[in-house]
Design a protein with these regions (language model features):
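Short catalytic helix/loop segments, enriched in acidic residues and glycine
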Residues: 19-34
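Extreme N-terminal starter segment of soluble prokaryotic enzymes
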Residues: 1-4
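Conserved N-terminal subdomain of the carbohydrate kinase-like
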Residues: 11-23, 40-121, 135-140
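Short secondary-structure boundary/capping elements
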Residues: 24-28, 101-106, 125-129, 152-155
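Active-site metal-binding loops of divalent metal-dependent hydrolases
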Residues: 7-9
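Thr-Gly-centered strand-to-loop micro-motif
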Residues: 26, 48, 146-147
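Gly/Ala-rich phosphate-binding loop of Rossmann-like dinucleotide-binding domains
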Residues: 37
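Conserved beta-alpha-beta core of the PfkB/ribokinase-like small-molecule kinase fold
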Residues: 119-180
Length: 180
């Protein structure tokens, strides 16, 4: 496996100065994997979804060459949900709702084929989960990228700082950088 992305596959409500979209497919892992599909042929995704997540969206990922063996489906539960409002400059946002749902008890188990990935993208998850994923790798990837947000800085800063010591690249906006 060349690239493994671990993160959220979710539903989002997004409000911008130009409009609003409700219950759209969201999540960092969703869009990281879709974007990477233009450049990487051998990639996998690790996440958890509820029974409410549309199967056709998983099929779409597979059609893009994204291996979805690492997506756990909890049929009786709801998928992660995030709602946010972006401001005029699109860098500043307010988190309105974070419903962890299936993510609340997510314990990712990397498929064996994923554990030797050359590149690892740790999406927006709890720092404890991010650390657990790092510890599941057979060897340190060539590059480890981490995404996080204000929510985790607010409730799990010590864990986040520990994970930061084991990554190469951090992707946050200017507001999050000031908060960190």
């Amino acid at each position: 496996m060349k690239l493994v992305t671990v993160g959220t596959v979710a539903f989002d409500d997004i409000e911008t100065p130009r409009g609003r979209a409700e219950m759209v497919i969201g999540g960092a892992a969703t869009y990281i994997s879709r974007s990477a599909s233009f450049f990487v042929e051998n990639q996998g995704i690790v996440s958890v979804i509820g029974g409410d997540f549309p199967e056709d969206e998983l099929e779409e990922m597979r059609s893009l060459g994204i291996n979805t063996d690492g997506i756990e489906i909890k049929k009786e539960e709801k998928s992660f949900f995030w709602a946010g409002r972006y401001h005029d400059n699109m860098n500043k946002r307010d988190t309105l709702i974070t419903d962890l749902n299936v993510l609340a008890n997510f314990e990712p188990k990397l498929p064996e084929a994923y554990r030797s990935a050359e590149y690892l993208m740790l999406g927006n998850l709890t720092p404890d989960i991010q650390m657990d994923v790092l510890n599941q790798m057979h060897k340190r990837p060539k590059l480890v990228v981490l995404d996080t947000m204000n929510f985790w800085m607010d409730i799990a800063l010590d864990g986040l700082v520990a994970v930061l010591k084991r990554i190469d690249v951090l992707t946050i906006n200017d507001e999050e950088a000031r908060q960190l």
